[in-house]
């Protein structure tokens, strides 16, 4: 049998990039159909296809790396570069919304009353639930670091406990933000204040949910003995993403909740 | 009828299990704290690459290649799995024109452009 003389992974042909592209097509055209013809069928079909694609693609990566041993040190290095570049692109995504916020708030227009917060907007008290949320996310950053050290030191029980705690803190944040959204005295339709507030915090909340899901998958894998004390890049990637989510919140809190109030 | 078969299978299984020694719920690894090491669990190409590195070998060329003087006394050592291998010589740093030539087993050959020496050394295909 011919074996390769290099350490890289020549991936087998896979249908998931195609199904992912089809899902993107169905979701976007489905969005247009929803707008014009009041039917959500196409969009829902696209979403289901997207979820199936993500599940099967990432399941295959776990099979290739953990079960088949294709993730040699050079391959792992490439995955690290990939995750860092992806998170960097997400940083730029949020940068745009911060730009919008500062554009609107540094020079408030006469329509807003020439002031920030705009006339008629009752802002949320930054020292109530938002401060609690800050503490929750910072604590989750501590617990995820605890989980990482537990894995590196071979401590299975501690790794599972600290990772579970991190996920619970993530859920608590999402729950508290949900309550805040429900009880907020302003909506997304309330001028540029509402727009910048809910789009920025809304996308952040979505990223918290994505990060929590990533960590939950890591918890499942840790319970099933996928990670070794030296090789656990899936977990490291989840932890990086979680720290990124935490940092974005800190910027949101300081800019929108505190300075902007 | 399917229910009767299922019941028979369950009772048979229970009888079999009673004769087997009870296994501890937590899998014991070499590391008693419960998380395996690469040495215990790495598999496939990753395992082969890591085990080779531990023995000081690099069959998958993961490390930076060794540097040689390229003189007659110290030629560039080129590992090869066959009787010949392509060599690309950058005669000077930052050269954009690569000098390509086949290096055959036997005596060291010289680059047709800069004259540095190359010697093909047979090595096994990693498997």
Swiss-Prot record, chain A:
Catalytic reaction list: 4 Fe(II)-[cytochrome c] + O2 + 8 H(+)(in) = 4 Fe(III)-[cytochrome c] + 2 H2O + 4 H(+)(out)
- One Pfam family cited in the UniProt record for this chain: COX3
Q: Which Gene3D superfamilies match?
A: 1.10.287.70, Cytochrome c oxidase, subunit III, four-helix bundle (1.20.120.80)
Annotated membrane topology is: Multi-pass membrane protein
Q: Does the keyword Ligase apply?
A: no
Q: Where are the transmembrane segments?
A: 16-34, 41-66, 73-105, 129-152, 156-183, 191-223, 233-256
A biological process from GO: mitochondrial electron transport, cytochrome c to oxygen
Protein's UniProt keywords contain Transmembrane: yes
Which residue ranges are assigned to the Mitochondrial intermembrane compartment in the record's topology?
A: 35-40, 106-128, 184-190, 257-261
The main location is: mitochondrion
Q: State the compartments where it is located.
A: Mitochondrion inner membrane
Q: Which residues form a coiled coil?
A: none
Which key words are in the record?
Answer: Membrane, Mitochondrion, Mitochondrion inner membrane, Translocase, Transmembrane, Transmembrane helix
One GO cellular-component annotation of the UniProt record comes to:
mitochondrial inner membrane
Q: Under which EC number(s) is this enzyme classified?
A: 7.1.1.9
Q: Spell out the family assignment given in the record's similarity comment.
A: Belongs to the cytochrome c oxidase subunit 3 family.
Q: What is the designated name of this protein?
A: Cytochrome c oxidase subunit 3
